[in-house]
Amino acid sequence: TVALPFFGELTEHVEDFLAERGYRTFVCNSMGKADREREYLDLLVSHRVDGIISSAHNDGLADYSSIHLPLVSVDRDLSPIVPNVRCDNEAGGRLAAEHLLKRGARRPALLTSRTGIHNLREKGYRQVLQQAGIEPVVLTVDFNTPNSERPRLIRERLDLVVDDIDAVFATDDLAAAQVMEWAAERDLRIPDDFKVIGFDGTVAMRHAL
């Protein structure tokens, strides 16, 4: 959804780039729902669009393999035959965890949307903690969670481990901002008492923070 800062900024730049070249852009927000994503795919194919750029985050959706249109994915692999544009998420996860440790964190947690082998930012985080002999603490708030509920769920996850952690690597900047709000509510000074690092580096979040 473009409600998230990263995808909002991505959509803005893609739309501007295409407009300068004479293309109109259809923006489809799947809101993390696989059924809605399938409906949008059917709609775009039926309208014979010139191509599809997808940044959807639904695992196991096989529909993309059967689309005979120019197609590229952003950030997440959709199919072995679909080109993918993304940063080095695993290296980014390592850099984030290493930075927290260098700044004095001893028990950094990971806050992410989904845990598992496909989460390369988590993989990088785990590698660094394993090398340092630190037990990982992974907190999840599902990607599909409505924006109105995310802050509450993040606070609940953090409250459960507040005595066991002294830093958080949040795999998106909006979550990092919500961790900072949680820390302020508990009189934890950043970065003196508690350390937080995000990932996206969006313009909106840099201005907000």
Q: Where do the model's predicted regions map?
A:
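Acidic, Gly/Pro-rich loop/turn segments at junctions of secondary structure
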Residues: 51-61, 76-81
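Short beta->alpha connector loops
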Residues: 31-34, 54-59, 115, 174
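Bacterial carbohydrate/catabolite-sensing allosteric modules
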Residues: 13-24, 39, 45-48, 66-73, ...
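Short catalytic-loop micro-motif centered on adjacent basic/acidic residues
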Residues: 26-28, 53-54, 109-110
